[in-house]
From Swiss-Prot:
Protein name (database record): Proteasome subunit beta type-9
Enzyme class: hydrolase
Entry's Gene Ontology cellular component terms: cytoplasm; nucleus; proteasome core complex, beta-subunit complex
Main function: The proteasome is a multicatalytic proteinase complex which is characterized by its ability to cleave peptides with Arg, Phe, Tyr, Leu, and Glu adjacent to the leaving group at neutral or slightly basic pH. The proteasome has an ATP-dependent proteolytic activity. This subunit is involved in antigen processing to generate class I binding peptides.
Assigned keywords, A-Z: Cytoplasm, Hydrolase, Immunity, Nucleus, Protease, Proteasome, Threonine protease, Zymogen
Compartment(s) of residence: Cytoplasm; Nucleus
Binding partners and assembly: The 26S proteasome consists of a 20S proteasome core and two 19S regulatory subunits. The 20S proteasome core is composed of 28 subunits that are arranged in four stacked rings, resulting in a barrel-shaped structure. The two end rings are each formed by seven alpha subunits, and the two central rings are each formed by seven beta subunits. The catalytic chamber with the active sites is on the inside of the barrel. Component of the immunoproteasome, where it displaces the equivalent housekeeping subunit PSMB6.
Species whose genome carries this gene: Oncorhynchus mykiss
């Protein structure tokens, strides 16, 4: 057995997504995005984790905080939504998914360390983005989270406009992620995007060398 004094520090550190996550509404749907870096302490343990987790066919969540805790919440909600849709015979509402995330997060707030942004499309409300944190449930036109969010608040406030097109929202998400990944040591890797509308969900991965650069990079 390895002497504890010789063990690398990351073996005893909690694995966290660090992360930058974002979601934004457009007329007819939503776009979610995230970086892909996962760290334990100062060590990067996964460079390409997809932090956009499927909750139902047209509902996703973006994960931040403890990787294990965030994935556990997402899997619990995914299971409950599947059961619900079978029982009622129709797809669940985005708000219902967000409420489940909120309830689980609040019930186990002393044990879990995770923040999820829930976004998707349903026939009643169209594209929707919800913030869930410590029992809070709030619908927003866009939301950012994770350690990288503090580096991009000024950028998103300046660049966001009402009634942006799907293509504009996709570029907005890519630019925000690229800026955060260039400044936040806990964000990096590739950028994952998912665009959701009435037709379904379209996933995309953008490699690091394909991301836009800024003047100081």
């Amino acid at each position: 057995m390895l002497d504890e004094s010789l063990e690398p520090g990351w073996l005893s550190e909690e694995v966290k997504t660090g992360t930058t996550i974002i979601a934004i509404e457009f007329d007819g749907g939503v776009v979610l995005g995230s970086d892909s870096r996962v760290s334990a302490g100062e060590t990067v343990v996964n460079r390409v984790m997809n932090k956009l987790s499927l909750l139902h066919d047209k509902i996703y969540c973006a994960l931040s905080g403890s990787a294990a805790d965030a994935q556990t919440i997402a899997e619990m909600v995914n299971y409950q939504l599947d059961v619900h849709s079978i029982e009622v015979g129709e797809d669940p509402q985005v708000r219902s998914a967000a409420t489940l995330v909120k309830n689980i997060s609040y019930k186990y707030k002393e044990d879990l360390s995770a923040h999820l942004i829930v976004a998707g499309w349903d026939k009643r409300g169209g594209g929707q983005v919800y913030v869930t944190l410590n029992g809070l449930l709030s619908r927003q036109p866009f939301a950012v989270g994770g350690s990288g969010s503090s580096y991009v608040y000024g950028f998103v406030d300046a660049e966001y406009r009402k009634a942006m097109s799907k293509e504009d929202c996709q570029q907005f998400v890519v630019n925000t992620l690229s800026l955060a990944m260039s400044r936040d040591g806990s964000s990096g890797g590739v950028a994952y995007l998912v665009t959701i509308d009435e037709k379904g969900a379209e996933e995309k991965c953008i490699l690091g060398n394909e991301l836009p650069t800024f003047y100081d990079q």
